[in-house]
Amino acid sequence: MKFVSTRGSAPEKTFSEALLTGLADDGVLYVPDVWPSLEISGDGDYLETAFEVMSLFTAESLDQVTFKKIIDEAYKSFDVQEIVPLIELDEQIFLMELFHGPTLAFKDIALQLVGGLFDYELNSRGEHLTIVGATSGDTGSAAIEACKGRQNLDIVILHPSNRVSEVQRRQMTTVDSFNVHNVAIEGTFDDCQDLVKAMFNDLEYRKKLKLGAVNSINWARVMAQIVYYVVASERLGSHDKPVIFSVPTGNFGNVFAGHAARNCGLNIPKLLVASNKNDILTQFFNSAEMKIDEVVPTLSPSMDIQISSNLERFIFELFERDGEKVRNLFEKFRLEGNVKVDSDIKAKFSNSWAGYSFDDEEVVKCISSQAESSGIILDPHSAVGILAARSHRDKQIDPEIPIVSLATAHPAKFPKAVERALGHCPPLPDRLADLHERPEFFTQLPNDLEVVKDHVISCSRINEK
């Protein structure tokens, strides 16, 4: 298997090459040249399923005995044996908890694996990588946790100043490691993401620092997330049984992993895109139109995004892998801030996708009512997913098909939202009990590409190698 660019103007790569480069040479995203077929007959054991699924993408590039060891090691730090518990909330509505990793967010599932893969590949090659990433809250801490203390890696994470929760920020900025560098950017997450993309698009700079990516622009992230869709289906009967998934999403990586699972043969008749008031994705899946607007701060800040990087992977599929058409659409979108796909394109996804969006008041009510009815406390992003699942079920669409809603973060990561709903803050796990007393280490920078590039150079140890 090879990996190809969504614009079609960059060389094909092996899995290992795509892992280390992150973005293609033409500045965009990798996808598999063909979708493999799932042949899974497991019982929902996470580690076994993870190896079976991901070996479809890695077998030609990685020694599989070694890869199995990397998988087993990646999930040792999770708090529960099943890795992703599945809980029935209502009749035929389930919650899959993805937040039992070291930083309490679903990003740990992919990034604990990616950190191990980076380490293996770089040690094998005797190379060094400078990781640069942007975060709307959870990716940063998960990436830092996965990469801290690794001799062949430096990691620089950009987050939007004052636009992540305090717990999210402190999980990043209290890490004191020689290879970890946090930067607060005076702007939005979209600004942070644009800075990262601009650095990758400067090929001379990229090669000089040997830049690597941990955001979901890196295919390995998406690959690792396919696994829990398969696991959910297995635990509900088999991977042939139809299951609808409700996915709170901002950057489209998590829900695209569900689409990838479907492309590999998993029976997912519909994916529900769950958004907050920053509902550009909901607009697209309901009307086939995208229109950039101002980012509105909400109680679910990880979804306060207007430009969703991973949507390009989906558009590439819609346009039957015509890179030129993809390029033209996104260039128009960047220039005009508005784009609509034709009716024949919309027809390709209108029956298999649906979009829902909710405001903060609805989210607060959901957290409150769920805690009262079941004792389960949802974080605001997971509440958006549950709201979408119930809204879909209320329409009596596919009533016999189970809906799995993905719980993406521990409620303690968003204490203000939970306190507003319940009148008290959820406690942090014991290992993070002193988080608010730990010293912070970060640099404040303007939204200025040259300033940020110079700072990344100062952080990288590449010249010491």
Language model features: what each stretch is:
Residues 1-465:
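PLP-dependent amino-acid enzyme catalytic core
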